[in-house]
């Protein structure tokens, strides 16, 4: 038996397939951070920390010839969201239902995705994660919803990165308002397509940013390390409901703040 205990749930394989497909679809739409940073893993459920390649050497040490240092690691945070589904409704999948009520699953996916997104963009103090916004707060370029002014702001952002030694393609992470604005048609295509040609990367929609953020696409500048990737496990059940949970473990760090 594995740690997820899925084989104990009163759920058919057909229903599990539907549950997993819905979870993948929801998470893919909700996890923007994974589209713009390096993702390492999954390393496994027992992977607990990312080695940082440094020693912390205490100043106060016992007298004698032997001294010691402690390896620095970035611990992974493990997140979990519980939810319940109706057993009869899951059985309906086997009866041919094509619109099963999986709203509780969708909500759980959005909650756990929001936690990861917040950790990537805003940081997670308890885990010593510093988010992308923290590094970008002193390197802002004003942008308004005007085609020429917006393209100029993107160009200024690129110039700022080059002055900091980051001469590489970039991705632009944008809020919902800017995402809609970039969909407008202009000579040469949509404004989004013009921006993508300009930056050499992608425009990525995210609910975790308020305006827009330019992030290097060369790789090696920020990383999300995954231990246990997002997975659904079984808690228990009664005659009407099956209790499940969504689980993951991860750590995030920025390696090159200028990017």
Annotate each language-model stretch with its function:
Residues 81, 168-170, 240-242:
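Structural beta-strand/beta-sheet cores of well-ordered domains, especially the beta-sheet scaffolds
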Residues 34, 38, 116-123, 162-165:
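Long, hydrophobic, amphipathic alpha-helical segments used as structural scaffolds
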Residues 72, 160-163, 233-234:
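A generic local secondary-structure boundary/capping motif
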Residues 84-87, 91-156:
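Alpha-helical scaffold segments that mediate packing/assembly in large oligomeric complexes
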Residues 2, 40, 185-259:
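Sequence/fold signature of self-assembling virion shell proteins
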């Amino acid at each position: 038996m594995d740690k997820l205990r899925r084989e104990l749930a009163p759920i058919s394989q057909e229903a599990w397939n539907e549950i997993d497909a819905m979870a993948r679809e929801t998470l893919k739409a909700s996890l923007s951070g994974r589209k713009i940073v390096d993702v390492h893993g999954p390393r496994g459920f027992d992977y607990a920390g990312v080695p940082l390649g440094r020693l912390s050497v205490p100043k106060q040490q016992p007298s004698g010839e032997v001294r010691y240092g402690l390896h620095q690691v970035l611990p992974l945070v493990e997140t979990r969201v519980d939810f319940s589904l109706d057993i009869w409704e899951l059985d309906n999948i086997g009866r041919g239902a094509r619109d099963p009520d999986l709203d509780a699953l969708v909500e759980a996916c959005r909650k756990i995705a929001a936690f990861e997104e917040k950790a990537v963009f805003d940081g997670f103090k308890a885990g010593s994660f510093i988010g992308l916004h923290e590094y970008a707060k002193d390197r802002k370029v004003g942008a308004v919803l005007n085609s020429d002014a917006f393209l100029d702001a993107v160009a200024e952002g690129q110039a700022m990165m080059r002055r900091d030694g980051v001469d590489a393609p970039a991705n632009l992470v944008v809020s919902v308002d800017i995402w809609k604005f970039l969909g407008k048609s202009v000579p040469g295509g949509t404004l989004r397509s013009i921006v993508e040609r300009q930056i050499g990367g992608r425009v990525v929609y995210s609910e975790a940013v308020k305006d827009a953020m330019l992030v290097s696409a060369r790789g090696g500048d920020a990383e999300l390390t995954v231990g246990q990737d997002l997975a659904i496990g079984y808690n228990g059940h009664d005659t009407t409901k099956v209790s499940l949970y969504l689980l993951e473990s991860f750590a995030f760090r920025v390696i090159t703040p200028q990017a």
